[in-house]
């Protein structure tokens, strides 16, 4: 059985499968959920709250306002001025300075 997470949105309740989430985009108290089928869901929850409900390793926080599903990660660029990820959907998202340092350290571990 797949893990279903149930949320209330503007039109009622929505059931999400964490593995089908492409990325999250937070804006204050709201979070836009982008699914792999192209659907978008707006929730009145913070990105931190949603990340707390997800199984470990499902989503990776790359900045204050973005989290991605590492399954759909195609490329990571960690140069001094250019820090971003490219997703399978073709989207390009900036990585924060602090998260870039964490990602560098993780990539150097054996």
State where each predicted segment sits.
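Basic, polyanion-interacting recognition surfaces, primarily
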Residues: 1-110
């Amino acid at each position: 059985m797949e893990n279903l997470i149930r949320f209330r949105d503007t039109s009622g309740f929505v059931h999400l499968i964490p593995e089908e989430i492409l990325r999250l985009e937070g804006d204050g108290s709201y979070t836009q959920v982008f699914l792999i089928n192209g659907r978008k869901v707006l929730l009145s929850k913070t990105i931190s709250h949603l990340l707390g409900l997800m199984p470990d390793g499902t989503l990776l926080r790359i900045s204050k306002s973005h989290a991605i599903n590492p399954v759909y990660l195609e490329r990571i660029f960690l140069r001094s001025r250019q820090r971003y990820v490219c997703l399978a959907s073709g989207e390009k998202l900036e990585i924060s300075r602090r998260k870039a340092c964490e990602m560098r350290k993780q990539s150097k571990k054996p």
